[in-house]
Amino acid sequence: MLKKLIIFFGVLMILGCGYKPVSVLTKEIIAEKVYVDVVIKKSDPANSVAIKDGFREAVIKRLNRDLSSQSDADTVIIANIANVVFVPTSFDRFGFVNAYEAQVSIDYKVKLSSGEPLNIIATGKSYFRMNRQVLDTIYTDSVITNQDRYNAIFEASKESFDELIAKLALKGYKLKKD
């Protein structure tokens, strides 16, 4: 009985404070049919593919929107990779890197369903470890594998997209309030 009472008051507090999920707030701005694309950098096409995969997954899973062709889309989001950096964050006792932080900055050009263009820069980070040391031997392989690199950029791009959605949700909240 006490558990039900606590759950009831918890739900009442959340509803009473005006909480709305991001997908509801962005519904005002981002239409059901969304076209997404990532401008592929010729100097680093592998990063572009990882970002494009993370970007598309985030639109489908986080916004519950359908991907469509550019001609059928009501909302268009074009991502341009501004910067991808791997920063060493941890070293083993021999001085070799064993953890990195991937930092991804993406310049989003968004055409809203209202036709209004927006330019938003968002960043994302992803941490990963490289534990390849065996017992007390010095193992100098602190090289980032292609799979580690892809996964880190993929996760960082999803975090960047979350920042974009948060900024769009804030804009949607302001529009609804006015």
Question: What are the residue ranges of the model-derived segments?
Answer:
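Soluble non-cytosolic domains of exported or imported proteins
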Residues: P45-G54, V97, E101, V143, ...
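C-terminal/domain-edge helix-coil "capping" segments
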Residues: G115, V134-D178
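Surface-exposed short loop/turn segments
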Residues: I78-Q147
